């Protein structure tokens, strides 16, 4: 049965054969994985098995992502004979595919925070897109992000974590909330020069319900 994963393993074998025919060896230092858009809405045609919808659950997606990472790494080690596992660099799904729960985007970020060989290069919401898919400039832009993260982690041996909250607390005043962030390159800046100012800088604190104009559907 032909599947995308079997195609992946076939490509490993073919690349190894070509390298071997020239007395060379293949080596894979990194896997770039960008996926998750179709896991925000259930669809019986998009699941792992026939008539089984794709998962939209955060924990299930994270489990499957980790399993896929392990499978790809092990197949690369077996086929290429290398000793070091390739690092797994992913992103956070964004644009029009996201929904209120942020389930898939959070699964991707959490996996990178929990596993040393998974690195999240960051979200794609700042990049330019057309109908959800990044346009040529958006892919160029995020491709540079992927290259920067790979170089910093695998070549320079440094660590990388994308911008993310580390602590959220209520202040002494009842109408104040303090959010602490991990900022890769300080300071954290709200850009109102290249982009129009977003209402409340994109933050919303609510009890029970939120502003309907902010709903992501």
Question: What are these language model-derived features?
Answer:
Residues 1-217:
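Cell-envelope and extracellular/periplasmic
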